[in-house]
Swiss-Prot record:
Domain of life: Bacteria
Organism: Shouchella clausii (strain KSM-K16) (Alkalihalobacillus clausii)
Function: With S4 and S5 plays an important role in translational accuracy.
Official protein name in the record: Small ribosomal subunit protein uS12
HAMAP family per record: Ribosomal_uS12_B
NCBIfam families the record matches: rpsL_bact (TIGR00981)
Subunit record text: Part of the 30S ribosomal subunit. Contacts proteins S8 and S17. May interact with IF1 in the 30S initiation complex.
GO biological process, one term: translation
């Protein structure tokens, strides 16, 4: 517990909250070839590697991921949600923030149904999260 005098001399320092998705908070100035502080909700990027990785201890699966080089020259690992995907190397994707708890180092999600990423096939519920169009009614 500080004394009144210590608080007058120094004061309280606010804690600075660290971003959960730091690559979305950087832009790139191609003329100056330098990074700028421009935050955005999503960013575009090009897949440099597409593969699978195994999750942390209690879980077991082959989770699909893509290594993405963003427009701000930062390379990040992004999760590919949903069943099945059409991504390859050099596919152009849109990423958003949001980590995957059981994959270490994966802090971003790829947006399904945007740019080169197709929506999930035959999905009926929660379609908006997976970029699936409304199915045609058969009468």
């Amino acid at each position: 517990m500080p004394t009144i005098n210590q608080l007058i001399r120094k004061g309280r320092v606010d804690k600075v909250k660290k971003s959960d998705s730091p690559a979305l908070n950087k832009g790139y100035n191609s003329f100056k070839k330098s990074q700028t502080d421009v935050s955005s909700p999503q960013k575009r990027g090009v897949c440099t590697r597409v593969g699978t990785m195994t999750p942390k201890k209690p879980n077991s699966a082959l989770r699909k991921y893509a290594r993405v080089r963003l427009t701000n020259q930062i390379e990040v690992t992004a999760y590919i949600p949903g069943i099945g995907h059409n991504l390859q190397e050099h596919s152009v994707v849109l990423i958003r923030g949001g980590r995957v708890k059981d994959l270490p180092g994966v802090r971003y999600h790829i947006v399904r149904g945007a740019l080169d990423t197709a929506g999930v096939q035959n999905r009926m519920q929660g379609r908006s999260k997976y970029g699936t169009k409304k199915p045609k009614d058969k009468k």
